[in-house]
Amino acid sequence: MDFKNIVIASAANDCTIYAAEELKKYVRKVSGVNLEITDVKPSDGCFFSLGRTAAVSDGDYGKMISALNGDGYYISAKDGNIFLAAKTDRGLIYVAYEYIEKFLGVRFLTAEEEFVPRERKIVLPTEPVAKTPLFNMRTYLTGDVFQERSDADFIAKTRTVDLFTESDEAHGGRLTVYGRNCNHNFHNYVPFEVYGNDHPEFYRFIHVNGETLPTVDITNGLTESGEVDEKKEVSVVKIVSEEIKKDLAKYPELEVVCLTQEDGPYYFDDENNEKLAAVYKRSGILIRFCNAVIRRVNRERAAAGKRPVKLMTFAYDYAKEAPVKEVEGKIVPIDETVVADENLIIQFALFCNGFYDYFSDKQYPFIKKTLKEWRAVAQDFWFWGYDVSFHRYLAYYDSFDNIEANVRGMKKEGITYFCMQGPHDTRKIWQNEIRAYAYRKLFYGDERSAAELTEEFIDLYYGAGAESVKKLMNIFHTAYKEAEAAGKVVTCENFGTHERAEINPEKMLYSAVAAIERGEKAVKSAGESDDQTQKLLKRLAGVKATPLMLLYDNFYFYHPEGSK
């Protein structure tokens, strides 16, 4: 087959052009074929057709995308040509990368490392490939896709779509979701510098991650029945509504606005809040407030002939307990005022014991209880999970066996945005690089198992040292399962037992160090170039840091006489 062209639309936007250029680049790297990008159907040679082009009829293209949702995509072949289709601009990027990975064999491992096979031919798919993401938005949150440390190309390559890092037009463009400061933003919608002097009653100052910040009284401006008190000229609920309208005027494409409590356990508290919390719980106070805001905003939009928008808020920390009660064995809302409006999204943000998946019978009971009870008062959910110990990034966090269960479980729960929190402020934690690879693939419906995906990453990323990494992981996993069987508590979380001596015997840690040292020897004798050898040794050093850190942290537990 003589491939010569990539056909795009004559008025192709930045997104399509980027996708075509990426396809051209990787076809050349893998096969040596240098394709020309054109907007004219070629008269000779085979071609790729990317999106709606002169090479495909509107009717045929409509059939290709008819069963797709969101950023889904479709790949097919006809008469020796390859057709790449999607419903969205972002989907066209994803379909290009799907072909690059599935048919050319390229693997995007990290923002700094990719695997590119050589001397392969351009492959025609024998059967159509159609994929739709499991979640409308999805991210495994590590530094390579997060804000100032992120890599725009890698965000696109991993099909990451989240709230945290805005993409330019070439990489998919602005999302239809927005919140000031992204999250934890009550105070951003009632600016203290604007209202603080005239209305000090709106605010309390609280401690948030080492800072002192204002938060606001979300009961201010509501009647006892949870409606907006129109007699009050200025109130928190009216201000928030007006500020959201400003955001919608600035970004008319928005579909969801994020309005969420400040981080941590503190909130505005006074006699009125205490009285209402005794009846509705803190979560009920939150729902009543958010209902009032989004209903007010959407009433005005309806009057102006505009579509409704949604509001997202957190079921997090002090507000994670659902505003429900039990009546004759059934979970029911406390009353109708705490039933979430149809345009109110609830985002769970629940810490767990990462040694078990979120849906395991061995998981903390409050998680299953929380998920069940919130369904009595709301219908639209996002989920922010945690796959990290913020206290010790390098401690062995044994959650590899839970990846598939977490992804499948969230899909079954109807979650539409799944954010799995890793170490967002660094790219360099070896365990999370592996799990991120598997999670990101599964988010988009990869047919392989999480175990196959983690093994693929390790083999490609660590080269001759791969078996030593697998050995270390097996050493830790075996030790933790034996500790569990012996009745010890195994927890992977902030300050979990995975950091401690009781489930990390000194002898086990030294055996883990020895495993990596054998890997280092294997790398040195593998005959790689000096640069590649040093790269692999540096990666293994990052893995070896885990048992070394645990030996250091727990030295006095192993050797209480050590200070002598």
Over which residues does each language-model region extend?
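Substrate-binding cleft/loops of secretory-pathway carbohydrate-active enzymes
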Residues: 312-350, 394-399, 428-435
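Acidic, His- and aromatic-enriched active-site or binding-groove loops in soluble protein domains
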Residues: 277-293, 331-356, 438-448
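Feature activates predominantly on carbohydrate-active enzymes
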Residues: 11-22, 26, 65-294, 298, ...
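Aromatic-lined carbohydrate-recognition surfaces of secreted/lumenal glycan-active proteins
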Residues: 290-325, 381-388, 418-421
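Catalytic domains of carbohydrate-active enzymes that cleave complex glycans
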Residues: 441-564
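Structural preference for beta-strand elements that scaffold enzyme active sites
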Residues: 139, 254-258, 308-312, 343-347, ...
